Structure formats: C-alpha cells, structure tokens
Amino acid sequence: FEGIAGAKMRLPSTPTALWLWLRGEDRGALLHRSRRLCALLAPAFEPQRITDAFVHDGGRDLSGYEDGTENPTGDAALAAAFVPPEAGALAGSSFVAVQHWQHSMPKFDAMTRAQQDACIGRERDSNEEMDDAPESAHVKRTAQEDFEPEAFVLRRSMPWAEGNEGGLVFVAFGHSFDAFEA
C-alpha cells in the first residue's frame, strides 16, 4: 500500500512486521496478556502502537451508525477472508489491512441528522441505505461489488477512545492483495 495525500487528509503507509489482535471481555486480563506478549517478543519486536478498542452500543461506530452491514456472510465470508486450500502453504491465511482512524466528533456533532445520514449514506435509526445518497457518502465509496474486480473482504471496525478523542480501528481480511489494490 502506498500512502495517499489530499488537500485535507493524509493516509500514510505504515507497514509492520507483526500485528497482534487480542480479544476478550476483561480489560485487565487483556492488559496483562499484552504485557506478557510484549515481554516475550521484546528481543525481536518493539511495539509501535497499542490500541484499546471496544464494542460500542451493540456493534455501532462512535457516530451511532451500525457497522459491518455489508459484510459477506457464511461461505462468502470465508471465501473473501481466507486463502483457499488449493493455494498450498498459504492456505487458511489472510492478508490484512489495518487502519487507525480518528473521528472529528465535534464536526460530526455539529451536522444536522440529515447531513450525518448523507455523510454515511444510511439512515441511522433504520440502518436503511439511502436511495439518493451523494457520491461522497461512505456507502458509495466502499461498495465492494462496484470495484473491478469485485473487492470483497471481511471487515471489522472497533471503536477506540483515549481521553476525549476517539475513532475506529478498521480491519479488513482478504484472500489476496487484489481487494486492497482496487
């Protein structure tokens, strides 16, 4: 992945050698497990970022919108996320992209509900995709079936907060690099 820069944003490329995802209900247990792993890996690896993420409001982003509604399910999810068995040594593995996003909550909160819905392309309360969503809407820019070739991945977002700042960690698992290059 090559970094991207625009007039109002910068998305740097930050490749890493190792990524760990620890999950659990007890934050204290996760902290201790993380500390043990960091100590075990310390001779070879130095942590670049540790993010404490969580489930918010039954799977919603901090903006209040339901997350992951367009994820493939069942066999389609397995096919999107994992290298197929016939691939040999890589069978069962995934290519992963991780993005750490910081939300501008004051800016989003200053929008009307209609403006927020248009920004996402869904109605927050019903989770229905808007027929007249603008091309700049999140759902229009991320429709996996609209890429050539189709760019299906299994996506997972995890809200994070530190002090008064927050956002999401976006994780995408793919069976090849193709979806990430679309």
Segments and roles (model prediction):
Residues 1-182:
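Long, histidine/aromatic-enriched segments associated with O2/redox biology
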